[in-house]
Amino acid sequence: MLVFARDPQTAGILGNALMVGDVSKTYLAVVRGWIPEQGSIDHPLRDEPEDRRRKSDPQPLREARTCYQRVAITEIPVAIEGHSTSRYSLVRLHPETGRKHQLRRHMKHIGHPIIGDANHGRGRHNRYFAERFGQGRLMLAAIEITFPHPVGGEMLVLKADPERSFNDVLTIFSEPLEELIS
């Protein structure tokens, strides 16, 4: 989901709304393991340098918070990491701050990496999903953004269904698709 401004002044207003926390975002993600029903992750993160060669330059820790709610869980009869079955959760994620790769890094931090995350996830699980569903995408989808209209100030709520490749993976959960993504 992308939001565009038609002129620099409006872009500045939208950018300011992001900076002061007036923008709310909601994502869906498929993660490894059975995550608790709900929770919050308050784990500071360092900015990741664009140039990986500069990784040795220490960056300051910045506050980072994410809230989550479990939508569904599943256990499939596929042995991936020494267990006879594999467990996954569908979660709704609400970042309260906006750090680079915050959701990916926070989910890894609590031991439930997002499926398809090559940098922060688990290769065996990612390969299984890529082989089973014919694509190796990151299983993270923006589904809602709420922000004040840059001119009138009324709250705008924009919603989007996940793309088809994301929905295809949701067939591992027993709940109907409409219940999972609403």
Go through each PLM region and give its residues.
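RNA pseudouridine synthases
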Residues: M1-S182
